[in-house]
Amino acid sequence: MEQFFYTETMTVMNADADFRSLLKPSALLRYVEQISTDHARAFGMDDQFFKERGVTFLVGKQALKFDRVPQRAETLTLTSRAQVSKHGSVKRITTLTDAEGKEVAMVDCRWIVASLTEGRILREPGWTVENFWNDTVEGELPLQLHKCKDGLTSAGEWTAHYSQCDLNGHLNNAFYL
C-alpha cells in the first residue's frame, strides 16, 4: 500500500548546534514539530481549521534515536508520516537523512487530539483528510516512561516565560532539553 508522507530539507543552524558543532536534541525536536505543522498546513489543517473545530494537537510522548549526530551547517532531509488515530493517539514517525541518503536520526512522536471546548482527549479526530493519514506507519521507538520507585528529588522550580512558550501557551517540548 502506498505510504503518504511529507518531506522538507533543513540546514542545521549555528544556534541549533552545541559547542562541538553537533545538533542539539532540543533542536531536532523543534524540527520535527515544524515539519509536522507544515505537513498539516499543506493539507489545509491550519490555525483556522483547528479553531473552527475547537481542537488542538498535543504531544503525548516522543522518543528520538541518533544513528549519527548531524553537524552544524549540514543539510538534512526530513520525512514524516502520520498514522490514523488509534486509541486516541496519532503515531507520527519522522526520519532524518543526510546528503548521501543515510538515516541519521528518527523520532517517534505520539500526538493526541484534544477538544479545547470540552477539555478532554478525543478518541477520533472527527474529520478526515485525503492522502494525509496512513493505515499503518513502519518504525517505532521505545516510549515507556520509567517511574522512580524511591521518590523524586526536587530540582527546583521554574517559571515559564513568554519566549519559552509555543502557540498554545505551553512550555515548548524542546525548550528544557
What are the functions of these language-model segments?
Residues 101-103:
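Residue-level signal for glycine
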Residues 1-59, 106-108, 114-177:
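Hot-dog-fold acyl-thioester-processing enzymes
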Residues 62-99:
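Hydrophobic beta-sheet segments that form the core/acyl-binding groove
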